[in-house]
Design a protein with these regions (language model features):
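Electron-transfer interface patches adjacent to heme c in soluble/periplasmic c-type cytochromes
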Residues: 90-134, 154-164
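Electrostatic cytochrome c docking/interface patches
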Residues: 36-66
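Bacterial N-terminal signal peptides
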Residues: 10-19
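Bacterial N-terminal signal peptides that target proteins for export
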Residues: 2-10
Length: 181
């Protein structure tokens, strides 16, 4: 059998192809913050007030709240508009009139909190440090010494502060709303 000689140009091509395949993720391929930020803006169900806000954190916060956190399911009452409940096989339509305004009952004495900005612009009426404390510890800001029930704060407590900051910044950007019926 004859020798197979591979031209250097082919070897170079193969080597570069392997290096390209092993490269770290980059913008636009779904593995970076930029694509999550853009997706967050794409899926935000309400108009956002970006004035004076960190745009990147707002977009990332929207992504976490709307694509990962499922916050709407408990903090919007009802979560979906009539005819828009995906759990009933209907095309999803978020209840934007009461979006994240709380009011969902989970038994006696347990009602989801309004996360929208209060009159001073603070989400749920909390400063960032208070919000961070709630998500890390589960301490109920309205009832000191008590832990939040139903809210999955033990899971959110594992998040890095930057992601919690992004959630907070997104909540600052959504419109204020009142709880549903």
């Amino acid at each position: 059998m004859g020798k197979h000689i591979v031209p250097r140009s082919v070897l170079l091509f193969i080597t570069l192809s392997m290096v390209w395949t092993l490269r770290p993720t980059s913008a636009g391929d779904g593995g970076d913050d930029e694509s999550r930020i853009q997706r967050g803006f794409d899926i935000a169900p309400v108009l956002l007030d970006l004035k004076g806000k960190n745009r990147a954190l707002v977009g990332l916060g929207s992504y976490i709240v709307n694509a990962q956190g499922g916050c709407n399911d408990c903090h919007t009452n009802p979560p979906y508009q009539n005819g828009g409940d995906p759990f009933l096989g209907q095309p999803k339509k978020i209840n934007v009139d009461h979006y994240l305004a709380g009011g969902m009952q989970f038994g006696p004495g347990v009602t989801s909190r309004n996360l929208t900005p209060d009159a001073t612009g603070l989400p749920a009426g909390l400063t960032f440090d208070q919000f961070l404390n709630v998500l890390h510890t589960g301490n109920d800001p309205e009832n000191p010494g008590e832990l939040l029930q139903v809210m999955p704060w033990p899971v959110y407590g594992n998040m890095v502060d930057r992601d919690i900051r992004a959630i907070y910044e997104y909540l600052r950007a959504i419109p204020s709303a009142q709880p549903g019926p």
